[in-house]
Amino acid sequence: MTQIDYTRAAKYFLLQDFWVGMKLGLKYFFSPKATINYPHEKGPLSPRFRGEHALRRYPNGEERCIACKLCEAICPAQAITIDAEPREDGSRRTTRYDIDMTKCIYCGFCQEACPVDAIVEGPNFEFATETREELFYDKEKLLSNGDRWEAEIARNLELDAPYR
């Protein structure tokens, strides 16, 4: 005669697995959602986030770049091109500052190499384009990015200062 396993039979007839599954489903149904609705909601960004490039200015409006070309030299993708001319006061300023964003690998070496924090990778990550030519940034485009994002860039650099 076969032995009846009463605990197994009780589980089967009382639908224990079904109720455990229902409890788990209801737990997750009423818990807060982990997913955000992206275009309408945005998650937090780290102060170290590396997004769209920008050239910064001093508070008096003068561009920060001193044409030392360290960013051009350190760029592993060779995406940065700089031409410079000396000024009457002996300092140098750029006449051409181009970044080919199709080559850029967003490593942040240009930002680390810059002695005056002129070139930074800003907080903007939504810069999709329709044509390839729009991804070739010239000096004017980089300066306008810097003007647009200056407040957030300055805040992020201040938050990151203890770690630099």
From Swiss-Prot:
One BP term from GO: aerobic respiration
* Cofactor binding note of this UniProt entry: Binds 2 [4Fe-4S] clusters per subunit.
GO molecular function terms noted in the UniProt entry: 4 iron, 4 sulfur cluster binding; iron ion binding; NADH:ubiquinone reductase (non-electrogenic) activity; quinone binding
Name the GO cellular-component terms. Answer: plasma membrane
Q: Provide the residue positions that the database annotates as binding [4Fe-4S] cluster 2.
A: 75, 104, 107, 110
User: What are its E.C. numbers?
Assistant: 7.1.1.-
Q: What enzyme class is recorded for this protein?
A: translocase
Q: Does the keyword Glycoprotein apply?
A: no
**Quick check: keyword Iron-sulfur in the entry?**
yes
SUPFAM superfamilies, from UniProt?
4Fe-4S ferredoxins
Residue span, 4Fe-4S ferredoxin-type domain: 55-85, 95-124
Q: Which positions are annotated as binding [4Fe-4S] cluster 1?
A: 65, 68, 71, 114
Pfam families given in the database record: Fer4_7
- Please give the cofactor(s) recorded in the UniProt entry for this protein: [4Fe-4S] cluster
Query: Coiled-coil intervals in this record?
Result: none
Q: What is its main location?
A: membrane
Which cell locations does it reside in?
A: Cell inner membrane
Instruction: Enumerate the UniProt keywords alphabetically.
Output: 4Fe-4S, Cell inner membrane, Cell membrane, Iron, Iron-sulfur, Membrane, Metal-binding, NAD, Quinone, Repeat, Translocase, Ubiquinone
Membrane-related topology note = Peripheral membrane protein
List the HAMAP family. NDH1_NuoI
Would you identify the family this protein belongs to, as annotated? Belongs to the complex I 23 kDa subunit family.
Q: What does this protein do?
A: NDH-1 shuttles electrons from NADH, via FMN and iron-sulfur (Fe-S) centers, to quinones in the respiratory chain. The immediate electron acceptor for the enzyme in this species is believed to be ubiquinone. Couples the redox reaction to proton translocation (for every two electrons transferred, four hydrogen ions are translocated across the cytoplasmic membrane), and thus conserves the redox energy in a proton gradient.
Q: How does it assemble?
A: NDH-1 is composed of 14 different subunits. Subunits NuoA, H, J, K, L, M, N constitute the membrane sector of the complex.
PANTHER family on file: NADH DEHYDROGENASE [UBIQUINONE] IRON-SULFUR PROTEIN 8, MITOCHONDRIAL, NADH DEHYDROGENASE UBIQUINONE IRON-SULFUR PROTEIN 8, MITOCHONDRIAL
Protein name, as recorded? NADH-quinone oxidoreductase subunit I
Query: To which species is this protein native?
Result: Ruegeria pomeroyi (strain ATCC 700808 / DSM 15171 / DSS-3) (Silicibacter pomeroyi)
